[in-house]
Amino acid sequence: MKKQKGISYKTKGWMIVLLLPITITIYILAIIGWQQLVKIPVVQEWAEIINSSTAKLDVPTEYIELYKKAEDNYGVPWTLLAAHHRIETRFSTMDPLLSPAGAEGHLQFMPCTFVGWSHPSCGGLGKGDIPEKDKISPAIIEQYGGYGVDANNDGKADPYDLEDAIFSAANYLAASGAADGEIEKAVFNYNHSEKYVEDVLHFYHLYESQVKNLQAAAYSSQ
């Protein structure tokens, strides 16, 4: 009985060479087919539900209520406040909450922005030479037109108090146009850096998307 010969290595090599273009073509057609398929409304809903079921909001839950309270007061999207908080101090995990340039607190305010640029010591980058007691005085802040807010009514507007800092950021962003939908302009006004704007908007859009997906998942489960 003769022993059957297997396919030679040379033949296998030619088979791979011949099949490779076919495989690549099928792969490309599959991608194009999916791109066309996802344009169908029913398929879009199906894909969104799948994405929503695994959605997770990457914001510490203990801060969300404060963001939403500030949104109610100033009309600034709470997801934008969360994005600023993330970029400025990594949700207050930066230690200390003081930058080399002199920005202070949970949302990194320059003292002159917090207290007011009309303060006689203010100029340059805004570090100023403001007495510590005046930095947290609502009366002094009102006098010099600053953005610091006493959100918890304890008699102090303190950038190192989380609630005060979030409300102050919302106040500043609202005055810069965020409450009227001018998000990019407001973010740039907060920090005159294109990279900063890009980073904040990245997280803002991410959180907006995650919230939408979570809402869709909750709705689909009803």
Give the location of each predicted region:
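N-terminal Lys/Arg-rich, disordered targeting/topogenic segments
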Residues: 1-13
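Intrinsically disordered, low-complexity regions enriched in Ser/Pro/Gly/Gln/His and often acidic
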Residues: 5-7, 27, 107
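Hydrophobic membrane-insertion alpha-helices, especially the h-region
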Residues: 14-32
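Catalytic glycan-binding domains that act on GlcNAc-containing polysaccharides
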Residues: 38-222
